[in-house]
Amino acid sequence: MATQFGPRRSAIIGKLLACCLAAFCAVANARAEIVKAENYHAFWLWAGVEPQPALQQAQEIYLLAGEVAGETQAHIISQRSAVPHLIGPKVWIVYRAQTIEWNDTILNDVLAHLDAWSSAGNNIAGLQIDFDAGTKHLENYAAFLSKVRAQLPSRYRLGVTGLLDWSAHADPEGLQALAVVVDEVVVQIYQGRHVIPGYEDYLAKLVALKVNFRIGLLQGGDWVAPQSLENSPFFKGYVVFLLNPKS
């Protein structure tokens, strides 16, 4: 039987619902934290981003060295005019890839770049490839990475960035193929300069990723750590993407 409320009772119920919603939002906001670089120890440093005080405490720096561009003929666009000597942190040399159609010249130049940084006295951890591989093509990406791994000296590790929807929509065979060839995946919860809404739901499914992984955070962005992260033996921490301060 339907029940009809009078205007006064309906107003009271409306106020109660509004209070409950406000309380819920307050709890959610209390749980979320703003990512502050000084609270972390691993960072991406892209070209054009000014060094920050937090880098002094860095244990690992993911440094953009170049971009592999070109739809018809791949070529490298260098992002660093010189090879600095970074004292202290481990350094990952990062290449942003628009294409994975690398010829031998491209791969040899990338590997030579790693050796040049190492010869300059830097503690090179390895090579990270930043490529937006689609969830339906991870096996093809893994095949490309296998070729890179075959040429990469054993003293260097191989890492990649990962998209959030890998955990939800990628086929298990593709994920397993990646797990065999790479040492780590850094899963980014942001796109461009914005945190992806609903990232918590994707991260809850990361248990399917049977490879060492980190979470890529955005400096100044929101972050709520799911309980499942700490329970995963494959979770290895965070990498913060640094931004220039807003003017």
Predicted regions and their residues:
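N-terminal secretory signal peptides that target proteins for export/translocation
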Residues: 1-10
